Amino acid sequence: THTACLSYEVLTGPPDRREQRARRLPEVSVINRENIAWLISFWGDDWPYDMVAVDEMSSFKSPTKRNKPTKKVIEDRTNEIVRALPRGLSSAEIEQKVTRELKKVRGELTRFGALCTVRKFISRFIGLTGTPAPNGLLDIWSQYYLLDQGRRLGTSFAGYRTRYFDGDYMGYKYTLKGGAFEKIVHQIEDITVSMRTEDFTDMPPLVYNTIKVRLPKKVMEQYKKFEKTMLLEEHDIEAVNAGVLTGKLLQLANGSVYDEEGQPIEIHDLKLDALERVIEEAAGAPVLVAYSYQFDLEKLRKRFKNAEVVGEAKNVVKRWNNGEVPILLAHPQSAGHGLNLQYGGCITVWYGLCWSLEYYQQLNKRLHRPGQTSTVFVHHIVAEGTADERVMRVLPEKNATQSALIDATAWVAET
């Protein structure tokens, strides 16, 4: 290929191996996202790379530069502060000084924050993603900041949000102002190229299907009461707020609910039964199954003894692509980016649904990608009358803005 003449190193493995390979300064250094902060810390102001290309750029969509300090960091720093205080202080004085010092404690840099510290040393920055705005155009600010250091969309996320969005009275939900979409596209179109796979490759069809399951009357009554009162009395489970309630309702739709101690309470097996029918109808064809919760995984492995899990064995992807894995279980968050699974099967089943459009689309594309020769089927097992149906409504709504952005910046091949 055209890159065969270049020298390269893969900066993975133990820190000493990474350091040794990094010091060789090949023409191309390849690193995973998890080690970016390490690489930046290693080089500091001696950063040697004048060009950076980031695959799956949307994984840098969070505009937060630092994570919140962990509980352990806070506890350790509190102990250090108290030990350093002079004797004889009152409890109120100690509390005041500790509070003041803790305000200075900062969490670790995020991926975005880490790259920001060395961006000034980079003359060319390229980002690639198939999901640039999975939750709307608020997602793109940090990605474009890394590309142009704020020249097009501004140097602060708050400023970008104020210029182009209107917030609700609580500041939780933001919607585009009139004409804002066109203004944003105008700002970024000179450095943005969108290419749809179907415009450049002959891809087989992608077919979406919904498989509905109906909860038994007693379970549905429990669900509705839980939804209304935020209390599942039969199992002494309480949802402390609307966000927790939504998660608990999705758990119940899947078949179990975590109690206050984090132990799963089994409610039903309807989704397992529906999945079993899909696998039987597949007549031996491999099936990729997306699950949501740990109890999902445990129930799936108990029901399907021949199932294997992405990430548990180093060669599981290779064996899947060789047709040696009949059922592959994957969590969307860990299997959504970068995996090539198109050679092993053409059936995906969403056993547990997810709110993230990015994870949803990325996992669907594990099978429907160049190299696939068969029609790809994506089945969704949906419990009727539950939060599952809400997820199925929300995902297309999220995709509308992203598709409009891709269309507005699309480059179509000449025919």
Explain the meaning of each model-derived region.
Residues 55-56:
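Walker B catalytic acidic pair
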